[in-house]
Structure formats: structure tokens, C-alpha cells
């Protein structure tokens, strides 16, 4: 601002506005000197601060350390002040009975030159000596409030988020689909989708058409994912529940236990198969011998033949035996005063040698081929293994596991059926056990 040293000087108080280090605008009443200067051929009143320099902000007057003040023009005898936009700016009281005022924004003219018009009427001004520490904390609070109000206003302008619709993500619907399919066991896509649509529409009522399409699409995607990880299976339109994958340790223990159980069952079935093959071979050997004897004209007497099946009781000659029979002859009760042995017909046939050494693993190659002709073709390898004594686990291994397993079942069923068939017909007397007198004496005392 241009000013001259000449002119009238008058000491008075004037309103000073300054901007602090935080960018806030404040005003205060300060002793000043008024000088009349000539500018553009017209007298202009120029105000200068007393006790502080108008050109620096680091004075010791207590104002410079808060903000920078400057020289401002006065037009007439009335005190003028700067009008700036700073709503809600206030200055605290410093003396008893003093007041403060709020400065509102007004349009000014000549802001670049420092000349201001339109005096503000009816305002009361504060006369105080500012405390730098209190002023700094107060200005910090004002700035914080200003920033908070700015952020609040900006957030209010932002677009409001709509609440979550029923169309949620794939993870959500995968869980829902899992629960539905597990609950039903067997279901279809339409049934699962209809149930989920009704549930979601009941909880969330928005755009029904849009949400239904979204839910059905999510259900379709979830079913494909679950089918890919083998949780469910799909056969045409029918969806079946398989189950969620379990923990690897639990799965390993369960498989290990199942493996042991199956191996034990296989072992038992192998023993059953071996016993059935032995019975089959013994019966075939008996039939062949009877045919050979009949062809030679040897016909046993009724006392020398025993009908199958039978049980032989073996004990000492001095043993006292008490035998009682029920009226329907379905039960026989024996009482012995000494030890005794009981043998069924199969055991007797084994002792008579009709197995040709097959049970002991001492069968000759000729007898092995002979026995193979008595059994079904799929059991021939078992006969060879029993005859040679090679009855390890390797005999049950095969390149074609499915065919081997099926052959195993068929052989077991055929052998069991043959045993039942033989037992049924031997009761009618079709098969006869012919024993020599020497053999009877050896087995029955």
C-alpha cells in the first residue's frame, strides 16, 4: 500500500483481522495510529498498528506469534474492518464485562488494494490481550470442528448405500444348497431353487423379479461347484447327496479299519471256500468209487451201507451210553460216563482217503488233474494250489480283479449249492457210503 509520512496522526483503537498458522481468521481491538495520506488526489485514512510492525509476524506484542497483521485503510471517521467468510468465529472473553461478536461474510470491493466499503453497524468489539497458549488451543479446537463439519457435510453428500439384497454371493448359496440337498437326500434343481427363493423373498422384499433370477443363477452355479468336488451327484434331473469330505486323519483311520475288516472277511471266506471244495471233492470221490464197485458187481448189504448225512460217535468199549430219542425223532440225547469223540460224514470221508491228499497238500499231479475234472473250471486253480500246498495270498491275486471277484462269488455259491444239493439227496438214499468191515472196525470201537 502506498502511504506518505506527512499528514495528521491520531491515536485510536481499531479492529484488526489476522490469519493464524492454522489458516483461521481472527479479529481484535488494537491501539493504532491514524494518518491522513493523499492517494489519487483524495485524502485517505491509513491505520498502522502501534507496538508491532505491520510487515512482519514475529513481533513481541503477542499478536505476531499468533498471526500476521497488516495495515488497512479507513474511509472516514468510523472504524472500518475486513469482512471475510468465517462463520461461527468467536473470540473468548479476557476481562470482566467485555463482550465479543461474530463476523459474518459480506461482499467487499477493492480487496486487492486493501480498501473496504460498507461499514458494519451495531457490532460490539472486544478489547483483550490474547494468551498465545490459550489462543493456540482454541484455534486448534475451531479448526478440528471445522474439519469435522466439512467431513460430515461431504459424507452427507455421498450417495447412500442400498441395503444388501437377497442376491448374495456364491459362498452363501453354496452353504444353503448343501443344507437343502443334505436335508432332502434326493431332490431337483427346481425344488432347491424354489425353496431358497421363497426363503430369501420372505426375509428381503425388494425387486422380486431381479432377485429371483439372481438366486436361481446362484443355485445353479452352487450345484455345479458341489458336483465338481463330489459332494453331490446328478443323474439327469435327480440330485443326490453324497457327503462332505472329512478330515484326512479321520478318513485314513476309517479306511484302515475298513481294510482290516474286509481282509478278515476275505480270510473267513477263503476258509469257507476251501472247506466247500474239500466236501465237493470228497463227495465226488465217494460217487466215483460207488460207480466203480457197482460196475464190478459189488453190491453192499443193507447193514454195510450208511445213508448220508450221518454222525459217528467214538468212545471206549467200556463206556456206558444212555441214548434217548424224542417222539418226533428230531432230537437225540446221549449221556456218556467217559470221554468220547464225534465225527460228521465229511470227516469220515477225509479219513477214508477220498480227498486224495488234497487236504494235506500231498496230491500227485495225476490226482490233481483228476480232481480238476470234478470241480467247475473257475475252481481249478484253487485245487492246484491246495494239492501243491501253495495256499498263500498270491493265489487270490489276478490281473482282472473284477472277473476274479465274480468268479470267487460264483464258485462259492456253486459249491454251497452243491453241498446243499448233496445233503438233500443223500437223505433219500441216492448216495450210499459203503465201508469195509476193516474200516468200520478202525473207526468205530
From Swiss-Prot:
Keyword presence, Transmembrane: no
Gene3D superfamilies: Transcription factor DP, Winged helix-like DNA-binding domain superfamily/Winged helix DNA-binding domain
GO molecular function, one term: DNA binding
Chief subcellular location: nucleus
Keywords: Activator, DNA-binding, Nucleus, Phosphoprotein, Repressor, Transcription, Transcription regulation
Modified residues (Phosphoserine): 398
Positions with biased composition (Acidic residues): 435-445
Localization (cell): Nucleus
Family: Belongs to the E2F/DP family.
PANTHER family hit by this protein: TRANSCRIPTION FACTOR DP
Subunit organization: Heterodimer of E2f and Dp. Cooperate to give sequence-specific DNA binding and optimal trans-activation. Component of the DREAM complex at least composed of Myb, Caf1-55, mip40, mip120, mip130, E2f2, Dp, Rbf, Rbf2, lin-52, HDAC1/Rpd3 and l(3)mbt.
Protein name: Transcription factor Dp
Amino acid at each position: 500500500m502506498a502511504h506518505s509520512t506527512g499528514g495528521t496522526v491520531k491515536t485510536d483503537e481499531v479492529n484488526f483481522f489476522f490469519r493464524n498458522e492454522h489458516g483461521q481468521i481472527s479479529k481484535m481491538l488494537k491501539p493504532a495510529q491514524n494518518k491522513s495520506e493523499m492517494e489519487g488526489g483524495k485524502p485517505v485514512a491509513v491505520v498502522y498498528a502501534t507496538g508491532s510492525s505491520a510487515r512482519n509476524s514475529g513481533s513481541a506484542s503477542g499478536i505476531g506469534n499468533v498471526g500476521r497483521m497488516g495495515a488497512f485503510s479507513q474511509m472516514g471517521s468510523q472504524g472500518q474492518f475486513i469482512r471475510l467468510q468465517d462463520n461461527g468465529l468467536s473470540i473468548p472473553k479476557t476481562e470482566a464485562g467485555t463482550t465479543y461478536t461474530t463476523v459474518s461474510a459480506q461482499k467487499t470491493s477493492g480487496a486487492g488494494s486493501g480498501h473496504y466499503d460498507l461499514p458494519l453497524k451495531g457490532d460490539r468489539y472486544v478489547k483483550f490481550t490474547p494468551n498465545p497458549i490459550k489462543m493456540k488451543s482454541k484455534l486448534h479446537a475451531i479448526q478440528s470442528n471445522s474439519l469435522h463439519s466439512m467431513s460430515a457435510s461431504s459424507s452427507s453428500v455421498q450417495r447412500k448405500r442400498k441395503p444388501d439384497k437377497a442376491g448374495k454371493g456364491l459362498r452363501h448359496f453354496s452353504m444353503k444348497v448343501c443344507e437343502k440337498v443334505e436335508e432332502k437326500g434326493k431332490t431337483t434343481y427346481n425344488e432347491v431353487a424354489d425353496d431358497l427363493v421363497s426363503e430369501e423373498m420372505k426375509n428381503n422384499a425388494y425387486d422380486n423379479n431381479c432377485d429371483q433370477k439372481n438366486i436361481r443363477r446362484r443355485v445353479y452355479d452352487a450345484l455345479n461347484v458341489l458336483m465338481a468336488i463330489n459332494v453331490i451327484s446328478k443323474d439327469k434331473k435327480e440330485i443326490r447327496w453324497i457327503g462332505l469330505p472329512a478330515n484326512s486323519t479321520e478318513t485314513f483311520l476309517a479306511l484302515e479299519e475298513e481294510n482290516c475288516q474286509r481282509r478278515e472277511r476275505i480270510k473267513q471266506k477263503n476258509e469257507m471256500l476251501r472247506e466247500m471244495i474239500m466236501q465237493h471233492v470228497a463227495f465226488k470221490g465217494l460217487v466215483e468209487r460207488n460207480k466203480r464197485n457197482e460196475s464190478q458187481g459189488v453190491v453192499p448189504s443193507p447193514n454195510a451201507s450208511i445213508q448220508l448225512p450221518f454222525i459217528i460217535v467214538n468212545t471206549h468199549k467200556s463206556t456206558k451210553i444212555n441214548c434217548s430219542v424224542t417222539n418226533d425223532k428230531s432230537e437225540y440225547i446221549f449221556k456218556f460216563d467217559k470221554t468220547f469223540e464225534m465225527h460228521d460224514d465229511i470227516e469220515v470221508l477225509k479219513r477214508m482217503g477220498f480227498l486224495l491228499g488234497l487236504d494235506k497238500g500231498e496230491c500227485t499231479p495225476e490226482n490233481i488233474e483228476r480232481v480238476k475234472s470234478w470241480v467247475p473250471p473257475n475252481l481249478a486253480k484253487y485245487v492246484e494250489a491246495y494239492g501243491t500246498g501253495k495256499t498263500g495270498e498270491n493265489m487270490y491275486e489276478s490281473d482282472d480283479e473284477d472277473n476274479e471277484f465274480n468268479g470267487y462269488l460264483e464258485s462259492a455259491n456253486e459249491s454251497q449249492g452243491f453241498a446243499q444239493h448233496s445233503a438233500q439227496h443223500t437223505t433219500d438214499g441216492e448216495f450210499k457210503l459203503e465201508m469195509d468191515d476193516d474200516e468200520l472196525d478202525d473207526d468205530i470201537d
